[in-house]
Amino acid sequence: MLLGTSRHLNNGQKNPFFYNRIKAAAALYFSGKIRYILVSGDNRFYSYNEPREMRRELMRAGIPDTCIVMDFAGFRTLDSVVRAKKVFGLNSITIISQEFHNERAIYIARYYNMDAVAYNAIDPSGNLGMQIQLREYLARAKMIIDLHVLRLGPYFLGTPIKIGKT
C-alpha cells in the first residue's frame, strides 16, 4: 500500500515526499517484491486527488494500470490501514512511505492485528524535514487518542473489493 501525500508543496514546487514514494513503490514492483499497489489517499475535492495523482505517476514509471488499485477514502493514515484490511481484505501488507510515516502506519496495522512491514522511501532533508517532524509529533499523539481513547475507525468502509485474480 502506497500512502498518499500531495504532489506539490504549498509553494507550487514538486513535493519530494510524493516523488520519493512513487520511486520506492516502482522499485518494489519492478524487483518482483509486490504484484499490486493499493494507492490510498485523500480526494475530498476534484482538484485534489492523491490516489489519481499517484496512479498517474506510477503509470508514467511503467507500472500497468491493472496492477494499481485506488482507495479514494484514505483521508488519514488510520483510514488507509484499516480500509486495507476491512475493505480490500489485506491482512498481510507492505506499507510504502517515509520512515516517520511508516512507523505510525505499522503501529496502526499491529493494533488491528495485521502482518505489516514497511518499505521506507527516501526522506528529504532540510526545512521540509523539520516541518514534517513537528506535524508527525502531533499526528502520533492524535493516533494514540484515536485508537486508545476515542476508539475511532475510518470515516468510510464500504463494499469489499478484491485485489488480484479471483
Predicted regions: what they are:
Residues 133-156:
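A transmembrane-helix-recognition feature enriched in membrane-embedded lipid enzymes
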Residues 154-166:
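Short linear elements at protein peripheries
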Residues 1-134:
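A structural signal for short, hydrophobic/glycine-enriched beta-strand patches
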